[in-house]
């Protein structure tokens, strides 16, 4: 009984004092949430909790809309539009925003348990039968199924759609759950489309766009965060494969943003304008792969400095941009890449994690000021 502390201490003490000539196997059985009914009765909740009502077990979560909830709501619309849409989770229906989908479309929802490798290959099987599978999974857990992603999906060029939650920093969940590497390990794969929205609206539009990708795998990465302003009733806007979006026109310096650091980029741009009297260009690249090469070619005409911003380790979006410039441009330009530091960052407030990794507006300005001077 793993809940009998006194017995466990006695056992450990016994074997500690005993002269052993080999390994000892202890089969210790525990039950999630034992002694607290709301936790015992909930298969997929209470693994990690915020403050909650002790009597009911209801967690006091923020009412602000999250990227995860945008995914859940948009998938319902896509499922209504296309009966081939299916969803897959590895024991995380509520954590990935699929709980409402599970209730409304039980025959098109699949929880495979804590078996990420099976989830990926299972989705590949669905894709071969002309279904449109969406695999909703945390970035850190997708790492467990990388072999299946490569061999069962990418090499076969199967149109599985990966919804990669918890990409980037995750605050209190710490280094074990940080989605630090997905851009790096997906952008190097042939036959893959990789997207990262800068807002809730962009995420909704990317989800709708992904429905039309029927010849290769795709991935949308998004953070554990709230979306800010969001109009749920707004119609879908068209997204074109591999095309970025000009947010602000300027000269000399071009910010190439990928993902939800766009507001930090805007703040850094304001600092440059106020302190150096220079209006910079800001691009929401949208795609880590394929990148908007035509846009980059056009920007070279009146920009000398290119700044990439991403919430990922080295080797991701920035590498795609660097490779393009190294192989395609004859003009002498400067490139500075902002990405996660080459270290594991422990539990902390997410704003502090940005500062530790050098992706705060102030640090961005500090680094860029070298070029301005």
Feature locations, PLM:
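Short beta->alpha connector loops at strand-helix junctions that form conserved
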Residues: 112-113, 137-138, 196-199, 309-311
């Amino acid at each position: 009984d793993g809940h009998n502390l006194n017995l466990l201490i006695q056992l450990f003490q016994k074997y500690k004092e005993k002269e052993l000539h080999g390994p000892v196997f202890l089969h210790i059985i525990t039950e999630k949430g034992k002694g607290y009914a709301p936790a015992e009765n909930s298969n997929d909740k209470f693994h990690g909790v915020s403050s909650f009502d002790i009597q009911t077990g209801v967690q006091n979560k923020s009412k602000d809309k999250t990227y995860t909830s945008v995914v859940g709501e948009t998938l319902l619309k896509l499922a209504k539009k296309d009966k081939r849409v299916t969803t897959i989770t590895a024991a995380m229906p509520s954590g990935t925003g699929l709980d409402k989908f599970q209730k409304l479309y039980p025959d098109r929802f699949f929880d495979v348990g804590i078996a990420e490798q099976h989830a990926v290959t299972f989705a590949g099987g669905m894709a071969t039968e002309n279904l449109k599978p969406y695999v909703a999974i945390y970035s850190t857990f997708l790492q467990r199924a990388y072999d299946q992603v490569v061999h069962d999906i990418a090499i076969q060029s199967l149109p599985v759609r990966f919804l990669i939650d918890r990409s980037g920093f995750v605050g209190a969940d710490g280094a074990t759950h940080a989605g630090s590497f997905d851009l790096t390990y997906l952008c190097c794969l042939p036959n893959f489309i990789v997207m990262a929205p800068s807002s809730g609206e962009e995420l909704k539009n990317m989800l709708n766009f992904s429905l039309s990708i029927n010849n290769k795998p795709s991935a949308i990465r998004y953070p554990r965060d709230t979306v800010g302003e969001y109009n749920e009733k707004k119609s879908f806007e068209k997204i074109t494969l591999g095309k970025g979006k000009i947010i602000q026109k300027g000269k000399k310096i071009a910010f190439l943003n990928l993902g939800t650091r766009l507001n930090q980029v805007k703040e850094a741009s304001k600092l440059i304008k106020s302190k150096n009297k220079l209006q910079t260009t800001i691009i929401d690249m949208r795609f880590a792969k394929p990148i908007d090469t035509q846009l980059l070619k056009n920007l070279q005409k009146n920009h000398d400095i290119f700044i990439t911003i991403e919430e990922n380790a080295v080797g991701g979006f920035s590498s795609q941009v660097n490779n393009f410039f190294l192989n395609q441009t004859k003009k002498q330009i400067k490139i500075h890449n902002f990405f996660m530091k080459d270290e594991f960052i422990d539990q902390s407030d997410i704003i502090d994690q940005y500062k530790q990794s050098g992706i705060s507006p102030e640090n961005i300005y500090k680094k860029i000021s070298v070029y301005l001077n």
